Amino acid sequence: MKAREVNFDGLVGLTHHYAGLSFGNEASTKHRFQVSNPKLAARQGLAKMKALADAGFPQAVIPPQERPNLAALRQIGFTGSDQQVLEKAWRAAPHLLSAASSASSMWVANAATVCPSADALDGKVHLTVANLNNKFHRASEAPGTERLLRAIFRDESRFAVHGALPQVAMFGDEGAANHNRLGGDYGEPGLQLFIYGREESGALVPARYPARQTLEASQAVARLNQVDPQRVMFAQQNPAVIDQGVFHNDVIAVSNRQVLFCHEHAFLHQQALFDALAEKVPGFTPLVVPAGAVSVQDAVETYLFNSQLLSRDDGTMVLVLPEESRRHEGVWRYLNTLVAADNPISELKVFDLRESMANGGGPACLRLRVVLTDDERQAVNPAVMMDDTLFTRLNAWVDKYYRDRLTQEDLVDPQLLREGREALDELSRLLSLGNVYPFQQ
């Protein structure tokens, strides 16, 4: 059956700030306490969505979550009115107020793992919410993510949204950022490749930074998503690159249809993995970047692999990159060599996403890929699909509510909380979401 990939991009939230919350993510740590610009961040994300929609790639939006997350602060012992909770957290533990105010839900590659209907035993599209167990500021996203996904993928005859795995280290799950799908046409059954960083009894783990995804979590997600067992493989990411800042697989590899674009050091036992993929995926095309051309450090700094690989109707592919890749002489030289060579990648598209990039999130982090047939696409909440009207409305909404400067000190301001709730109340109507936010209950 004919199907297309729809990219659902996360809309940056009003509390986007730099707090260095993500140990193992070097950009996040490097830009700690810098001044952020939430308005610019949201506009940069919207510009990418609209440009890709205009280029013929179906595009939709996932709204931000309510932040500061007062329920999370109350759960860890801060009491009183909303304003008192903010003030007590700020005085006692500003890093916890930062965590509860994080706009990290913008990186929807970590929202869920998706199984297209062609790969599922029951013929439905499945989405399993990620628990993001490794980081407090992200683990609190799961309930909000589930509500938002249910408001977008409402038709239970076509879509199955599953809640997150248990919030324990054994089932640490980071969503689609550690998941690749390979195959032919999108509507045909494909092969799902789950990438993990550690397993419960395994000795091979990184030494410096945490491995956030477990094999046990990947296996559980595959079961929940009803992936045909004949169409799934599990592979371990190279622990050495995790220690160099590759905290998710989408920082060192990206796949699309038959192509896997990755670094020479991306996977443990990489050649054996490629041999297995070649047996299962007709026309499997690994495009491997040698360390001599691009080091792991340069890949992390430029987010060369945190890119989007998109298919045109003629079978060629477009690689969507952050501006940082163009500014690095060696990486840009390599990319131009790649495009000139005999492979499906025929064009580079570059976007300025520096507000997101400074927190460690590139083009791939900002999107959740969902393969949908025409009928399934018709069943998605139509209000979230990107077009001229939605683009204009969302930009006007951002201009109305977002600040152009935010520091950690601003998070205690009760006016920021009020602005956020007013904005999200309006957004929930604009996107026909219903009452999805806690303050609306």
From Swiss-Prot:
Active site: which residues? E174, H248, C365
Domain of life (superkingdom): Bacteria
The UniProt annotation places substrate binding at 19-28, 110, 137-138, 212, 250, 359
Going by the record, the broad EC class of this enzyme is: hydrolase
The question of whether Hydrolase is a record keyword is answered with yes
Molecular function terms in GO for this entry? N-succinylarginine dihydrolase activity
* Pathway(s) where this gene product acts: Amino-acid degradation; L-arginine degradation via AST pathway; L-glutamate and succinate from L-arginine: step 2/5
Keywords noted in UniProt:
Arginine metabolism, Hydrolase
Q: Has UniProt tagged this entry with the keyword Isomerase?
A: no
One Pfam family of this protein, by short name?
A: AstB
> What does the subunit section of this Swiss-Prot or TrEMBL entry state?
Homodimer.
Query: Which family does the similarity line name?
Result: Belongs to the succinylarginine dihydrolase family.
Q: What is this protein called?
A: N-succinylarginine dihydrolase
Q: Which organism is it from?
A: Cronobacter sakazakii (strain ATCC BAA-894)
